[in-house]
């Protein structure tokens, strides 16, 4: 039995997301704001950090474009919209199989 090399993204799946420079800027900007009276507590985000994310929306007919909630190391998350699959900054990938 062969393992498929390509899996279609679906809502609720966990993926890895590689932060881009724009992502880091937006995360740092949000960190300076207060959410619901609670400050943001997290480890610093850096270009190229690979973080877990959950697929929150898929776009039919766009191949691998999805919206993601990226889990930061702390009490905050980041919404990454219309991101494609790949290995570059600002793209998501499937976690490696172990």
Predicted segments — roles?
Residues 22-50:
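Short, Lys/Arg- and Gly-enriched loop/turn segments at beta-strand edges
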Residues 21, 43-44, 60, 65:
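Short, flexible, surface-exposed loop segments at domain boundaries
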Residues 1-6, 31, 37-39, 96-98:
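Basic/polar N-terminal segments that are highly enriched at the extreme N-terminus
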Residues 4-5, 14, 18-25:
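Short, charged beta-turn/beta-strand-edge "cap" motif at the junction between a beta-strand
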Residues 56-98:
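Intrinsically disordered, low-complexity, charged/polar segments
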Residues 8-10:
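Short, well-ordered loop/turn sites that connect or cap secondary structure elements
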């Amino acid at each position: 039995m062969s393992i498929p090399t390509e899996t279609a993204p679906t809502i609720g799946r966990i993926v890895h997301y590689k932060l881009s420079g724009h992502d880091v800027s937006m995360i740092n900007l949000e960190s300076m704001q207060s959410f619901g009276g609670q400050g943001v507590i997290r480890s610093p985000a850096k270009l190229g950090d690979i973080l877990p994310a959950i697929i929150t929306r898929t776009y039919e007919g766009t191949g691998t474009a999805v919206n993601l909630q990226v889990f930061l190391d702390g009490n905050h998350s980041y919404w990454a919209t219309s991101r494609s699959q790949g290995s570059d900054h600002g793209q998501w990938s499937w976690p490696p199989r172990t």
